[in-house]
Amino acid sequence: FRVEHGDVGGVSIDKHGTPLLPSVRDSAASADAVLFGGVGGPKWDTPDASVRPEDALLQLRSHLGVFANIRPVKVYPWLADSSALKPSVLEGVDLVVVRELTGGLYYAQPKGRTETPQGWSAVDTMRYSEAEVERILRVGFRLAQSRQGKLASVDKANVLECSRLW
């Protein structure tokens, strides 16, 4: 068992001037597993930054082909009273959220901020290919088959063309 450490995000920006060194990216790619911590913090949380800590995470996701975020929802009985929902609603919750990580708003161009006579303006572009949608849906379907057999796609198909593709 061998553990390697690499600087990513804000720490890497401070030390190396970039959120992710190619050597760290390559080390992650050749590893059997990657344990990843946070990339940023208040020090690097400035909207005007040209180099951002989270770019490390986006680069790693893309390079490693990590496209599915799988988040099970677990309700701990001793915390149920702390929820905004009634404990009776939380009983028996069996939910897993599957989120696509490498398409859409994170990667599509154009994106950016510009100053106009009326103030600042920002744009993010949402773009998905049919292959990206199919890939994440297959993850969701496989997961649903191994559980209760139910899958819900949460979108905004009444107004977003990208959602209609789903």
Give the positions of each predicted feature:
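Residue-level detector of anion-binding/catalytic polar loops
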Residues: 2, 34, 150
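A short beta-strand-loop structural module common to alpha/beta enzyme folds
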Residues: 2-11
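Short, ordered loop/turn segments at secondary-structure junctions
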Residues: 8, 39, 75, 156-157
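Short, active-site-adjacent cap segments at secondary-structure transitions
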Residues: 11, 42-43, 159-161
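Short, flexible loop segments at the rims of nucleotide/cofactor-binding pockets, characterized by
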Residues: 11-16, 129-130
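N-terminal glycine-rich phosphate/adenylate-binding segment common to multiple enzyme folds
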Residues: 14-123
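Glycine-rich phosphate/diphosphate-binding loop of Rossmann-like nucleotide-binding domains
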Residues: 117-166
